[in-house]
Regions:
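Cytochrome P450
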Residues: 1-380
Length: 380
């Protein structure tokens, strides 16, 4: 989950404030944590897990809160769920979800790219991937809204309550599955329940809940935010819509990655120093926390001289939207596929424009992207 100071003077566009962070190598936030904004420092932190540990959260986080051998084993066990073959098998289901969602669009009527499209698609796409029942949709949509509100507040008590609510949903799903008659796994969640550690131990209930929380709890909101950012970009850059309709999948994915670099909704991750070390000319003591601000790093003028310039090919190698190093996002293949299917589906049949008389509303730190983007999808 993204974390950084929750009071921000640049309400109209928090990226202005993030861009200002580049003036100093490191800064302190309201919680006395080091904020890492420069691209080279962000890369240095996340590629050195021995010096900068990912074991920060008070909650068990598998695999993103693990280090060393435990993290390596978790990735070996879980990364196959995102294999190319699995993504190819999932694609037709996502196409079906997209068709069903877009069939409900009324021509000429304003809808919110984040809530009406992004959030609903995120829940339906993740449910299709995991084999979760459609009846969960209202509960998951309500949870997403409450989770963003709690994160926005910066109050640990509120975020803890929301986290426990999501864990309760997962426990309920798991209990239903465990009372079923034995047989081959019916879906991906069934497969996950049967995963075993390298020494033969089955994953514990707390580990399974953590994995599913990581896969869904964060990704539901992130996918909705990405949808809002992408459709806002399409609406404000109409010439790109025609270009992307004719693009190959690889070119389309690079374009979306670049849009997300320019306006990265994955704001930050934390690390904690394990030893005394120097970073950007600052002395970091053991036990001190760092907030790696991905949004700022992806707009570092030392790497991207004009951060708002759209260059999918030229900027690809330095793009940090999905992180880098041993903790590079394992779910990138899934997120890329989900976004491609939805956004291609939108562009295949529609031209996107901002709804007249409305103003998109930015999310506020520590959440990125937009809270609402009113758009109209005009039939081609």
């Amino acid at each position: 989950m993204s974390e950084c100071p929750h009071h921000h003077p640049f309400a109209d566009d928090p990226r202005i404030g993030y861009d200002a962070l580049h003036a100093e190598p490191l800064t302190r936030d309201a919680h006395d944590r080091w904020v890492v904004a420069r691209h080279r420092d962000a890369v240095a932190v996340v590629t050195d897990p021995e010096t900068f540990s990912s074991h920060v959260s008070r909650f068990l986080q598998v695999p993103n809160g693990l280090d060393g051998a435990a993290h390596g084993e978790a990735r070996e066990l879980l990364d196959p769920f995102f294999s190319a073959d699995r993504m190819a098998a999932l694609a037709p289901l996502l196409e079906e979800v997209t068709r069903g969602l877009l069939a409900g669009v009324t021509p000429g009527q304003s809808l919110d790219a984040v809530l009406d499209l992004g959030s609903v698609y995120a829940v339906r796409a993740q449910s299709a991937w995991l084999g979760w029942p459609a009846e969960l949709e209202p509960e998951l949509l309500a949870w997403m809204d409450d989770n963003h509100a709690a994160t926005r507040s910066g109050e640990l008590s509120r975020t803890a309550v929301v986290a426990h609510r999501f864990d309760a949903i997962i426990h309920r799903l798991l209990s239903f599955r465990r009372i079923r008659k034995p047989g081959p796994p019916a879906d991906l969640t069934d497969e996950l329940i049967r995963v075993k550690h390298h020494d033969g131990r089955p994953l514990g209930e707390d580990e399974i809940v953590s994995v599913l929380r990581n896969w869904t709890g964060g990704d539901l909101g992130s996918l909705a935010l990405c949808t809002g950012v992408a459709l806002y970009w399409f609406a404000t850059h109409p010439e790109l819509q025609d270009e992307l309709r004719a693009a190959s999948d690889d070119d389309f994915d690079r374009a979306v990655d670049e849009i997300l670099r320019i306006d990265d909704p994955f704001v930050s991750n934390r690390r904690v120093a394990t030893v005394q070390t120097d970073l950007g000319g600052r002395q970091i003591g053991p036990g001190e926390q760092l907030v790696v601000n991905w949004t700022a790093a992806n707009r570092d003028p030392d790497v991207f001289p004009d951060p708002d310039r759209y260059d999918p090919v030229g900027h690809a190698a330095a793009n940090l939207v999905y992180g880098t190093g041993p903790h590079v996002c394992p779910g990138r293949p899934l997120a890329t596929l989900e976004l491609r299917v939805l956004l291609r589906g939108v562009l295949r049949e529609h031209r996107v424009r901002l709804a007249p008389g409305t103003t998109p509303e930015r999310e506020q730190p520590p959440v990125g992207g937009f809270r609402r983007v009113p758009v109209i999808l005009d039939p081609l």
